[in-house]
Design a protein with these regions (language model features):
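Glycosyltransferase donor-sugar binding loop
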Residues: 39-42, 210-225, 243
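Membrane-proximal helix-turn-helix segments that form the acceptor-binding/catalytic region
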Residues: 106-126
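Donor nucleotide-sugar binding/catalytic pocket of nucleotide-sugar-dependent glycosyltransferases
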Residues: 122-164
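Conserved donor-binding/catalytic core segment of Leloir-type glycosyltransferases
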Residues: 128, 170-189, 195-198, 212
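Nucleotide-activated donor-binding/catalytic signature segment of Leloir-type glycosyltransferases, i.e.
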Residues: 224-248
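Short alpha-helical donor nucleotide-sugar binding micro-motif in glycosyltransferases
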Residues: 252-257
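Aromatic "clamp/platform" in nucleotide-sugar-dependent glycosyltransferases that forms part
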Residues: 265
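Short hydrophobic beta-strand element within catalytic cores of glycosyltransferases
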Residues: 282-285
Length: 301
């Protein structure tokens, strides 16, 4: 028996990819043969970690398919042909309308993804939802199979590694309040709402404050430009976009943060909330989607 994990894209530092890799280690420790196949493989992923989905050979009826579902994918369209035991881990799919004005490709793939999820309702044996919110989504889309909630697997030992000294040195112990949000620059994350709240705080409460919006804007350049225009229109200073950075730098930004401010409108889980809790950073968040479930009573909603 082989346990195959399938996903559309395995990326460096992505929550779905990290969950896949963490589960891979658990499966190996249990003594099972296992392999990861993805349609797209980030060049930064160590060679041999995953194989291209097109190279997936014959799957035996005694094997197990675990499909990490988070976007539109050929895997969804092929799913019915696998005659083995099948499990879907549902990470949720961002509503496509968020991307309509910013990236036509993203809009199409997320729209297709929603349609594909519904088509899989009667084609899987079992589902794992990474949040109660995701479980409710699956039920609403017609899934009647057993569904359990299992949060994303997070390798907490990685967060005990040494943070980037340059970031620590530059932004700590200077009397300024550091406001942080981490997550890709994307419309559903509502970075404009974070900026607006920060601008009010900086103007009326504490001029010695700065905002870090950590995350990649790849594919969302139009949205990023709109955020810059919004910052200029508000006349607010000290809004910093570090971009897609190294892991030790992410650790450092959590170390120097005084508060984590999340205004996201759609999250299937939201790993950064757990990261902020790991570093004991106070959290203020908008009560949407899976946010409250992930916080579990922590933070201010």
């Amino acid at each position: 028996m082989v346990v195959y994990q399938l996903l559309a894209t395995i990326s460096f530092g992505d929550a779905v990819s990290n969950d896949t890799l963490a589960l891979q280690e658990i499966i190996k420790k249990m003594g099972y043969k296992t392999a990861i196949f993805a349609e797209n493989i980030d060049s930064r992923i160590p060679k041999g970690t995953a194989k291209n989905y097109s190279k997936l050979g014959r799957v035996d009826k005694n094997d197990i398919i675990i499909y990490h579902l988070s976007t539109g994918s050929k895997i969804s369209r092929d799913f019915d042909k696998f005659k083995c035991r099948k499990i879907i881990i549902y990470h949720n799919i961002t509503p496509p309308d968020y991307f309509k004005d910013y990236n036509d490709g993203s809009y199409r793939i997320y729209k297709k993804g929603y349609e594909e999820v519904k088509s899989l309702a009667d084609k899987t044996d079992y589902c794992i939802a990474v949040s109660e919110y995701n479980k409710q989504n699956l039920r609403e889309m017609g899934f009647t199979c057993p569904i359990d909630v299992l949060p994303i697997l997070i390798p907490f030992e990685d967060y005990d590694k040494k943070p980037n000294e340059e970031v620590i040195r530059k932004y700590s112990d200077d009397g300024w309040v550091n406001v942080l949000f981490t997550g890709r620059i994307a419309p559903n994350k509502k970075q404009e709402d974070v900026i607006r709240a920060f601008a009010y705080y900086k103007k009326y409460y504490n001029p010695k404050s700065r905002l870090f919006l950590v995350g990649s804007s790849g594919g969302m350049e139009r949205y990023h430009r709109r955020l810059i225009s919004y910052i200029n229109a508000l006349g607010v200073r000290d809004v910093i976009f570090p971009g897609h950075i190294k892991f030790d730098e992410i650790l450092a930004y959590y170390r120097v943060a005084d508060v984590f401010l999340c205004q996201s409108e759609h999250e299937g889980f939201c790993v950064p909330l757990v990261e902020a809790m790991k570093f004991a950073v106070p959290i203020v968040a908008y009560d949407s989607s899976a946010i409250a479930g992930t916080l579990g009573g922590s933070g201010i909603l």
